[in-house]
From Swiss-Prot:
Keyword annotations from UniProtKB, A to Z: Ribonucleoprotein, Ribosomal protein
Originating species: Staphylothermus marinus (strain ATCC 43588 / DSM 3639 / JCM 9404 / F1)
Similarity field: Belongs to the eukaryotic ribosomal protein eL34 family.
GO cellular component assignments: ribonucleoprotein complex; ribosome
Pfam families (UniProt xref): Ribosomal_L34e
Gene Ontology molecular function terms on file: structural constituent of ribosome
Protein's GO biological process: translation
InterPro entries with a match to the protein in the record: Ribosomal_eL34, Ribosomal_eL34_C_sf, Ribosomal_eL34_CS, Ribosomal_L34e_arc-type
Protein name in UniProt: Large ribosomal subunit protein eL34
Keyword Acyltransferase attached: no
Length: 92
């Protein structure tokens, strides 16, 4: 019988076979949804779907791409944004 705190669907059930041959259920937090672009809403590549405690253990470069606005804006929107800003600075 699970503890009352584990009788919720907000936890993921993982079936694990123990060395003794029994199958037991481990309760883990669910993965969060993918990080999305702030402009177009497309899921971002290079940003892991991890809970904050596991994300904290990653190196800085494993958390998001190494480019301006990496982990916040997708490359397509970034290139469009840079083109617009350069054109605006040239015209004025």
């Amino acid at each position: 019988m699970p503890r009352p705190g584990l009788k919720t669907r907000s936890k993921r059930r993982v079936y694990v076979r123990t060395p003794g041959g029994k199958v037991v259920i481990h309760y883990e937090p669910r993965k969060p949804g993918p990080a999305r672009c702030a402009i177009c809403g497309k899921p971002l590549n290079g940003v892991p779907r991890l809970i904050p405690s596991k994300l904290r253990k990653l190196a800085k470069t494993e958390k998001r791409p190494e480019r301006p606005y990496g982990g916040y804006i997708c490359p397509r929107c970034l290139s469009r944004l840079l083109r617009e800003s350069i054109r605006a600075s040239i015209s004025s």
